[in-house]
């Protein structure tokens, strides 16, 4: 990630932009770009893993419709959607702790997924461990 956003935050009736987190008054929470670069370099070192940096949107529901996916992509400029990363980013931002969200993408979030969830989680865990091992091994 280079940013995270909470796509389900909406205090727009009060005049705020959609996604604004009250109290810290921010929509796009910045991740650690240098760490993201190092993680992508480690993924390239492992091979067979595509690393894409961009904004990740988080919310309180699974996104499984093309309509919702389009709304999140167009409203926030997100390249991926999930349920945890922005909450972690929010806590890190408030406490001045660097972070970077890494996601393994299982489907297109449009209702077309046919991947077996248990097979995907095993592959995602294996790839994540390989990338983190390479990151630590490279000393970058």
Tell where the protein language model's regions lie, with residue ranges.
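Glycine-rich phosphate- or other oxyanion-binding loops that anchor nucleotides, phosphorylated ligands
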Residues: 1-140
């Amino acid at each position: 990630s280079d940013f995270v956003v909470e796509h389900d935050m909406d205090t727009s009736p009060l005049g705020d932009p959609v996604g604004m987190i009250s109290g810290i008054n921010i929509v796009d929470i910045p991740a650690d770009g240098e760490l993201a670069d190092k993680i992508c370099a480690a993924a390239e070192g492992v091979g067979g893993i595509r690393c894409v940096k961009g904004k990740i949107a988080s919310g309180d529901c699974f996104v499984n419709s093309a309509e919702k996916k389009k709304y999140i992509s167009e409203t926030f400029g997100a390249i991926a959607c999930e349920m945890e990363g922005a909450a972690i980013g929010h806590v890190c931002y408030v406490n001045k702790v660097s972070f970077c969200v890494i996601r393994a993408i299982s489907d297109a979030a449009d209702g077309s997924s046919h991947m077996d969830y248990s097979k995907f989680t095993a592959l995602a865990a294996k790839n994540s461990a390989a990338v983190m091992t390479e990151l630590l091994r490279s000393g970058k």
